Amino acid sequence: MEMQKEYPMTQEGFDKLEVELEHLKTVRRPEVVEKIKVARSFGDLSENSEYDAAKDEQGFVEQEITKIEMMLRHAVIIEDDGSKSEVQIGRTVTFAEVPGNEEESYKIVGSAEADPFEGKISNESPIAKALLGKKVGDEVNVPLPNGNEMRVKIVEIS
């Protein structure tokens, strides 16, 4: 029997997934069922593009529901222990490239709630893996997508 993957996440991320799941079940699912019903009323299903599109959408919605339910079932909530002494999941880390002083900040979260456009990176990303467990003042090499590395200094953990 294989071990089920755990999904580390903040309470905020867990709550957001619960809201998304509720929306999928109570809004999106009924919408798709209605689209299928309307498309069926057009008659012949063999050449009914509306029906095919609605069935595809239904498959996507059901897949999302299943995925989110599984993630919530296997979620591991990262408790905030109040310590800001080292980089950990749920913390925002500010670092600067060495040499240089241009700072960047990212919140390290579980993969389920990662969103680079909101400044949230997955704990499984190369940059987060390099930073986790480090302290303010530490310098670390962060792997870049092109195969090179960038040296950064941790400026702040919040």
Swiss-Prot record:
Transmembrane segments: none annotated. PROSITE patterns: GREAB_1, GREAB_2. The keyword Cell division does not apply. It comes from Macrococcus caseolyticus (strain JCSC5402) (Macrococcoides caseolyticum). This is Transcription elongation factor GreA. NCBIfam families: greA, PRK00226.1-2, PRK00226.1-4. Gene3D superfamilies: Transcription elongation factor, GreA/GreB, C-terminal domain, Transcription elongation factor, GreA/GreB, N-terminal domain. The gene is greA. Keywords: DNA-binding, Transcription, Transcription regulation. One of its GO terms (biological process) is DNA-templated transcription elongation. Necessary for efficient RNA polymerase transcription elongation past template-encoded arresting sites. The arresting sites in DNA have the property of trapping a certain fraction of elongating RNA polymerases that pass through, resulting in locked ternary complexes. Cleavage of the nascent transcript by cleavage factors such as GreA or GreB allows the resumption of elongation from the new 3'terminus. GreA releases sequences of 2 to 3 nucleotides.
